[in-house]
């Protein structure tokens, strides 16, 4: 995806060097150092699409004649059929494709590059391919959200311990826990959709950076390529890669969401609170009893790759002057690597949770550890009229007095402490049955029926909201894909007029 000053095409019969650049610098070790041809396989199809749209526009504007346009478009079809591996040597895929066209058509093949620099060509190809990757990642995330919603439906009554600082905090449910990540993935979806809007802009027609004297139609190439709009300023359009930063940032944020989920599952697995399916675990080479959550550990580890990609991209772009610098050749790979890695992580993380076994009895017992129902007892006293801070003091004293094998105080212990602090019997505020219910993790969860809480009715409402959000995002995704597909159909229809 390199670029530089464009050159006139020399004699097409000279095959010793790439057709496009043979009139200038000789070959040597630096030539291979400059080349990104191998890496550019990812944007091979994108370049062909960009070339076709550009040639159709040139012919429509009578910048090149119809016969030449037809010859070039036919040559591009041959190049596509031959594939990336058959391209001649070149600094990048763009130069190699142009050389392959000139080899087939002759010097007139060089007219394909009229009114264009590789600067705007490269930018268009990156945007074209990146939007496809974004949509694929969004589809994967949407699928993961659907899996998590199904887990929430199935486990809405499965009580589990909730933690802060990795210490037992309050009882919750598997459904409530899993929906917390589904909601985070909703926001990750939104960030990717937002990035798509700024990626899907057409830089073609900007040329090197100062536009072109030819009467090009930038809106036409935008329509043929499925771009929603034109990137307005020609210098910015050719030079900027901030859309890569925005996309990679969204991907790194998504990876961070996944790392939290992965860490939760790793910790829960270590306590016997979840049993991963064998497909998402491995054993030790020496300790046959082990069932290790390796896949989740790798999801956690790959987050570092995504963050490193973002840092690498920002470092690459830092301090680059307008308008083009070869540093940019290294920019795209940071985004591609992050996207590929995190897309796999989404699939693995969601699959691990969806296929896991959640042992209800074990989890309910664990939900009593460390007097995790303490907040519920304090809330019960507060609802009976005791100032919350006073209620907090009563329960804190009870927690401090627990023995090493005790998970929660009984009614008598709480009653004695309450009388010491309040100056009157506990029964003045709450009866025994209500207090014992508050000490029970299942009842404690049922009490927490505020919007967004873990109580079954509150979870059911969250599931409903999540399903609606999922449907809305699926619709947006389908619309984006349809727009791209329709543009491809329009482009092929126009190409067929010439070939």
From Swiss-Prot:
Coiled coil: none annotated. Residues 7-22 have a biased composition (Basic and acidic residues). Its EC number is 4.3.2.1. Keywords: Amino-acid biosynthesis, Arginine biosynthesis, Cytoplasm, Lyase. It is an enzyme of class 4 (lyase). Gene3D superfamilies: Fumarase/aspartase (C-terminal domain), Fumarase/aspartase (Central domain), Fumarase/aspartase (N-terminal domain). It comes from the Archaea. GO terms for biological process: arginine biosynthetic process via ornithine; L-arginine biosynthetic process. SUPFAM superfamilies: L-aspartase-like. One of its GO terms (molecular function) is argininosuccinate lyase activity. Its main location: cytoplasm. Residues 1-22 are annotated as: Disordered. It is found in: Cytoplasm. It catalyses: 2-(N(omega)-L-arginino)succinate = fumarate + L-arginine. Pathway: Amino-acid biosynthesis; L-arginine biosynthesis; L-arginine from L-ornithine and carbamoyl phosphate: step 3/3. NCBIfam families: argH (TIGR00838). Belongs to the lyase 1 family. Argininosuccinate lyase subfamily. This is Argininosuccinate lyase. The gene is argH.
